[in-house]
């Protein structure tokens, strides 16, 4: 079987606590080992911009990575892109599709509330952003068996 690595990472909830405490430090460690070479696209409804995301990533690394190397942090921040918008607004996903450019195998990481999983998945599908993609769900998958079953249909 042919190995097909992702060619972009999309972080939904990029300005949230999970990304700040766990995901950004993990990305730093991948970059340190030269294992992260693809664009990392943050998506959030924070009213910020790329500069704001870069500042947040730098603060996260400063707080959670002991002895961080500024050159590695710089390499990581050079990979960053940002899409600001509402998860309920199709325009956010149109902007994401444009930011993904030629990416054929993006990894969509959902570090967002479970209540918007289905909406995000539907918008990704409706804008052509899921063909060849993978979706990682970070949160509990539903509140109970019935809601988990509904989400698995999406």
Q: Which residues are covered by each model-predicted region?
A:
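N-terminal low-complexity, Ser/Thr- and acidic-residue-enriched intrinsically disordered segments
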Residues: 1-52, 97-98
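Short glycine-/polar-rich loops that comprise or flank the Walker A/P-loop
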Residues: 6-7, 34-39, 77-79, 105, ...
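Conserved acidic residues
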Residues: 86
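Beta-loop-alpha module in the N-terminal Rossmann-like domain of NAD(P)-dependent dehydrogenases
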Residues: 90-94, 98-134, 141-145
